[in-house]
Amino acid sequence: MATTIDQTSIKSLHFHQVIRLIITIIFLAFLFLIGPTSSMNHHLHESSSKNTMAPSKRFLLQPSTPSSSTMKMRPTAHPRRSGTSSSSARKRRREFRAEAHEVPSGPNPISN
C-alpha cells in the first residue's frame, strides 16, 4: 500500500505539532519550577535578614555644650631652639621654602 502525498503531509504536520507540544510542556514545567524557587529564595532571604538583625533603635546623645558654641582647636606654639641647626634641617628648609621657579604655560606636554 502506497501512501499518498496528502497522507505524508498530514503525518509531517502531526509530527511537528507533537514536537511543539512537547517543547511547550517542557518550557512551562521549567517556568513552574523556577518561579516558586526564586520567590522562596527571596522570602527566605527576607526572613533570615529579619531574624539575624535585631531591631535597632537610634538614640542621639545629648550634647554637653550647646551647638552654638565652638571648640577652639588652635595648636600650641612650641618655642624655637636657638643655636646651630643641623644640616638636615637646613636642607628641609631649603627644599620647602624654595624660591620661585619656572612654570611652563600652555597645555600639559606630557598628556599630548
From Swiss-Prot:
Residues 41-112 are annotated as: Disordered. It comes from the Eukaryota. The modification Hydroxyproline is found at P104, P107. The keyword Signal applies. GO terms for biological process: axillary shoot meristem initiation; cell-cell signaling involved in cell fate commitment; maintenance of root meristem identity; phloem development; phloem or xylem histogenesis; procambium histogenesis; regulation of cell differentiation; xylem development. Coiled coil: none annotated. Residues 62-71 have a biased composition (Polar residues). Residues 1-39 form the signal peptide. Glycans are attached at P107. GO terms for molecular function: receptor serine/threonine kinase binding. One of its GO terms (cellular component) is apoplast. Keywords: Developmental protein, Differentiation, Glycoprotein, Hydroxylation, Secreted, Signal. Belongs to the CLV3/ESR signal peptide family. This is CLAVATA3/ESR (CLE)-related protein 44. It comes from Arabidopsis thaliana. The gene is CLE44.
